Amino acid sequence: MKPDRDTLDEYFEYDAEEFLVSLALLITEGRTPECSVKGRTESFHCPPAQSCYPVTTKHECSDKLAQCRQARRTRSEVTLLWKNNLPIMVEMMLLPDCCYSDDGPTTEGIDLNDPAIKQDALLLERWILEPVPRQNGDRFIEEKTLLLAVRSFVFFSQLSAWLSVSHGAIPRNILYRISAADVDLQWNFSQTPIEHVFPVPNVSHNVALKVSVQSLPRQSNYPVLTCSIHTNIGLYEKRIQQHKLKTHQHHNPNEAEQCGTNSSQRLCSKQTWTMAPESVLHAKSGPSPEYTAAVKNIKLYPGTGSKSDHGTSQANILGFSGIGDIKSQETSVRTLKSFSMVDSSISNRQSFWQSAGETNPLIGSLIQERQEIIARIAQHLIHCDPSTSHVSGRPFNTQESSSLHSKLFRVSQENENVGKGKEAFSMTFGSPEFSSPEDTNEGKIRLKPETPRSETCISNDFYSHMPVGETNPLIGSLLQERQDVIARIAQHLEHIDPTASHIPRQSFNMHDSSSVASKVFRSSYEDKNLLKKNKDESSVSISHTKCSLLGDISDGKNLVPNKCFTSFKNNSKEKCSLKHQTRNQCQNNPSEIIQSTYQETQNKSSSLSTSSILSQHKENNLDLTSRFKEQEMSNGIDKQYSNCTTIDKQICTNKYKEKIINENYNPKFFGNLQSDDSKKNDSKIKVTVLEMSEYLNKYESMSSNKDSKRPKTCEQNTQLNSIENYLNKDNEGFKCKKSDQLKNEQDKQEDPTNEKSQNYSQRRSIKDCLSTCEQPKNTEVLRTTLKHSNVWRKHNFHSLDGTSTRAFHPQTGLPLLSSPVPQRKTQSGCFDLDSSLLHLKSFSSRSPRPCLNIEDDPDIHEKPFLSSSAPPITSLSLLGNFEESVLNYRFDPLGIVDGFTAEVGASGAFCPTHLTLPVEVSFYSVSDDNAPSPYMGVITLESLGKRGYRVPPSGTIQVTLFNPNKTVVKMFVVIYDLRDMPANHQTFLRQRTFSVPVKQEVKRSVNKENIRHTEERLLRYLIHLRFQSSKSGKIYLHRDVRLLFSRKSMEVDSGAAYELKSYTESPTNPQFSPRC
């Protein structure tokens, strides 16, 4: 026979050994880094926060997962120490990122006895779990309480704060060490630690567990972690600076005198590569496993040079592939090699944050000192990089943007601000795009600065004039795999780099460049933010136009997402070859040109520049241009257009065909287009846009007749030779065939004034245009307005019990007024109550009231129909009123809503475990006017056992009610004192919450019955608690907890002069009754 639990002093929810393992796993895996807003998570091995929650999917450990292997190792170590009655010590520390892996809290592959690790590691926490003799006394805590306290400490720890502010980016190398709590085995803190001792629970009948933790004081900045291997990099940096100065003086001593001798004193934001903070990058897109593993495991390989996998071309874009000896600097050319850390100058770092508005200074402060080491390594890597670049005549000054991520060395932008009022755009290159020889051999670019040497001497510290040297192929194969890893990381970072540079670029000329793959021109935030600052157009002449670059002559407000930007000068020679070029374009890639008719319809001020530039492209650049334009749209227009049918493409193409046939040889039109493009005058642009819109309106009728014929393709028609010249980004006049046919005849007869007004009305979003394009012909677009919930009241809804109601939803039967039941938005735009949550039961076939057809009686609509639903006044005896009838199930519910839950807890002499239990919520139809009643909820406690939920003899009971959306509906707090309750007795408490006028004072008399005589107060919430005492005098909540709650929240009522007041009542004569 099972002994009565009351005969025992206490019971234990956990086995002592299992509880200890749960604590250790919570400490070691309770803040596992992850790429999210929270930055960390609890692993599957941690004990659940709420033991009452059902375990949906139980985790099964696998030997293939490193975390599972580590958890198994932790379990075995803790168990072994506990069986030997030894105190357990868990130390948490950080390791430098340069020479240690970041696979998480694991010790695999790491020798913890290595003195180098002990020297490099930063100890953050030291936990001691020590068994002590059993604690005796009235005041004790349960194991669950200690588990909650440890979880709270872990949640608010310093490590959790770092992970949270960096969204899981830093720190990455977290190491946990489990050992016996011996003084000789303890590692030392860098500062005096802060100690915290937790309450001591009994884990068995003989043993209690004492848990204490020592932690490092809170740090304002992320600590500097330097490993013993790389502490001598500062020597390299000094030698590099001396060598740079020597080389620079050898080539141009005059410039060296002007620029000074100390490179550290010439940190200029326009001539540095600023390191983007890791956490800023990962805040938007977390690091992939490939990224983190690759970046963190970059080692320093010795060597004297390398043959880059970029190929043997001398005009490669610089990509950092490895580190070499200092001697290799004598035999290699560095055209792009300026590098500086964000934190190398305080003012420089602040200006960087101001220019990159998306960065967070808090994150930068955390990793500021950490990146100092990375900067030195990167500085060394720059001078040891084997890549070469042929510079024609003069050094090319570079501007490196903040998109350079830590340990990823690539050139993102090449620029300099050199002119007096000159402003230029730049090209953006990433090293992974030139990872194949065929790409780089075709993409050789010779750069010729337009500025004299005297203007570029300001940044002579950041480049060197070294002759073109021979690269050493001996370590090329060694660095090949490393370069591939960096290329993949760079490609990943191209899409998630949030930082930007606002510095204008230097103008340069392009020579001998053939068709470069379109992947070179990748989108970057640096150039977009650059355009916001540029108010003028820079002039860059491109010889032979080998590389097709799109221009933007806007005022900086209308942006085109850019792969690379420049603007072009118009010349007569290019005008002459306009027809031939556009004809070739149409013959080669008609489908891409057709797509561009939609892709180029967003930006008005950029449209004329784009059309004139595209007309100057040569035949060998068409493929690049088309690909680039397809990537250009920033608002998903290209994606939307892909949903259009082939017929729609042909329709749009035919409209342009008709326009081009009549306008292709119109020199006046070309003159207007070229004039507006070159002058950059807003008024001229508007005139040209209007003129093009008039042409569209003029020939839409002609195109509509041929659209009905639906020709198969337009690829073979040479009449499309000038499509690119008529792209108008303000057009919406490229409207789809459906809209064109509806307005065809009116467009013919409209005068210019009407055309202008129509042109203005057509300036809607391109998304509307595309959605209209997808509609069938001769189909009207139906607009459905958002319906208010009162619309449902107009339906004559008959409930299942025979009553007609206008107060409940016609489909779900739920109350129409604001309800705790979650809403969902239907396809029609109306908000319905979720019918999936509704289950109807216990319907009465008889109706106590006649059927009211309110809509048929017009007099009722003119008079306010006052609700007579209970409780109007709770002034009579309890028997027979609404409150007692509902609480005692005298009403049949109209329906039951699933999904409500409640958290039940208590506090007093001890704190029992909080429970989360389901709540059965029902509603009724009780009034003559069918007004909805309050909801009733029942929390069943029978699942906890025959006795129920044990609570202290006196204290507070808290019941928090959640709706199916897990939103708090009401929190009930009931203060009670049952210390006088005899054994084997029972009683109840009932707390009512009323809404009463704010200015009216309720006068309390000796007789509590008078409280209920205020006519203006309304019952909003009620909770009914049942208590019973065991034979030993312990108090339990038993059977169930019953709730009444309002249809809508009254705490934040709209301007009502009411307040909520609660009153708790209990039986008085007798106060306690014997148990049955």
From Swiss-Prot:
Highest taxon of source: Eukaryota
Region (Disordered): 700-721, 739-765
Basic and acidic residues composition bias: residue spans: 739-754
Keywords of the record: Nucleus
Transactivation domain 2 (TAD2) as annotated region, ranges: 962-970
Stretches for region Transactivation domain 1 (TAD1): 24-32
Location of this chain's protein in the cell: Nucleus
A Gene Ontology term for the protein's cellular component: nucleus
InterPro entries referenced in this protein's UniProt entry, alphabetically: Atos-like_C, Atos-like_cons_dom, ATOS_Transcription_Regulators
Region Required for macropage invasion, residue ranges: 878-935
Function text: Transcription regulator that syncronizes transcriptional and translational programs to promote macrophage invasion of tissues.
Sequence similarity: Belongs to the ATOS family.
Record remark: domains: The protein contains 2 transactivation domains (TAD). Each of these domains may be required for transcriptional activation of a subset of target genes.
Designated name of the protein: Atos homolog protein A
Primary gene name: ATOSA
